[in-house]
């Protein structure tokens, strides 16, 4: 079940998700990010406009700094040989940042976010890891909206670093540095727009599938459009200043940037975006893909809720068969999220 938040209402978009744990608790977590419900967008716009004006106002003589801009201007003015125009130029730059935030924030009114997390396993530890990703996500989202008025690539890099194992913590636990065993969590976060554009970042999660209403099949999506990083915390960028403080399976050449944000567009009414965790489909079995495609075809004209539930019902029946043949160990938590263009 979603952690928090009502289903966002976007013109021309129908969405619904659900999750079934394999045990009492599970490592799957999904959440609707309803920006209008969670954040006071009008209040944030008003604050940004207020700060844009305040940052231009000189600090009265003898008064303490009112904000970080005042603080930095004081530092500039105390430096030897500083250019007299530098403090004013700095104030103008910081003011313009707030004006841009005020311009970007209104777009959140017509944006719906979706967060999917899959922590390896389906017990208490897995649930705790998924919860850590969730809590980190929302803490950093507050920072993003304060600083930029939208999500940026650096947001995802910070979440990735939070899930990495630090050298200090590993040593404190007495773990062998050569022991590669660790808890794994994948994450997919995307934002949907009314025109059918879905922009997302993927850390180790099975790639989305797109079902064409016209052709009744899953469409092939070029791999070049489906950027995917390893699961959270496994790969630290080599240009990150703290890279030596974390264990990393490999070093990435650079930090996440805008070119790593993948895009999928639902072109026609009835087209469906299918997000899922590997308890439903691991993204590799062609026969399983065909079965899911059949379920999708049989329910494609139904609302997103019914499509989601039909896919989960299929996955549960498949699990019942696995139990009958003694393969309980491959049963995992199941999450399905459907986004349909009306």
Per-region residue spans from a language model:
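Conserved N-terminal boundary motif of the eukaryotic protein kinase catalytic domain
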Residues: 14-15
């Amino acid at each position: 079940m979603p952690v928090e938040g009502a289903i966002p209402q976007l013109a021309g978009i129908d969405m619904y998700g659900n999750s079934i744990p394999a045990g009492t608790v599970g490592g799957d977590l999904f959440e609707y990010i309803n920006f209008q419900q969670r954040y006071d967008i009008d209040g944030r716009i008003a604050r940004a406009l207020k700060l844009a004006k305040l940052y231009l106002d000189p600090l009265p003589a003898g008064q303490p700094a009112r904000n970080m801009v005042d603080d930095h201007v004081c530092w500039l003015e105390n430096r030897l040989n500083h250019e007299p125009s530098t403090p004013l130029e700095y104030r103008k730059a910081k003011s313009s940042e707030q004006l841009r935030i005020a311009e970007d924030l209104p777009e959140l009114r017509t944006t719906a976010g979706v967060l999917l997390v899959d922590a390896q396993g389906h017990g208490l530890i897995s649930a705790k890891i998924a919860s850590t990703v969730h809590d980190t996500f929302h803490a950093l989202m507050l920072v993003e909206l304060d600083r930029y008025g939208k999500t940026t690539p650096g947001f995802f890099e910070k979440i990735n670093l939070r899930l990495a194992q630090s050298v200090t913590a590993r040593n404190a636990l007495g773990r062998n540095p050569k022991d590669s065993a660790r808890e794994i969590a994948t994450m997919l976060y995307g934002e949907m727009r009314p025109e059918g554009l879905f922009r997302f970042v993927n850390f180790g999660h099975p790639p989305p599938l797109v079902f064409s209403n016209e052709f009744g099949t899953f469409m092939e999506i070029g791999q070049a459009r489906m950027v995917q990083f390893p699961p959270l915390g496994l790969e630290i960028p080599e240009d990150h200043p703290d890279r030596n403080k974390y264990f990393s399976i490999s070093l990435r050449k650079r930090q996440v940037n805008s070119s790593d944000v993948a895009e999928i567009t639902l072109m026609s009414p009835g087209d469906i975006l299918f997000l899922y965790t590997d308890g439903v489909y691991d993204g590799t079995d062609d026969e399983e893909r065909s079965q899911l495609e059949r379920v999708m075809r049989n329910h494609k004209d139904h609302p997103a809720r019914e499509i989601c539930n039909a896919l989960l019902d299929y996955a549960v029946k498949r699990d019942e068969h696995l139990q009958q043949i003694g393969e309980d160990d491959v049963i995992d938590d199941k999450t399905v999220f459907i986004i349909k263009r009306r």
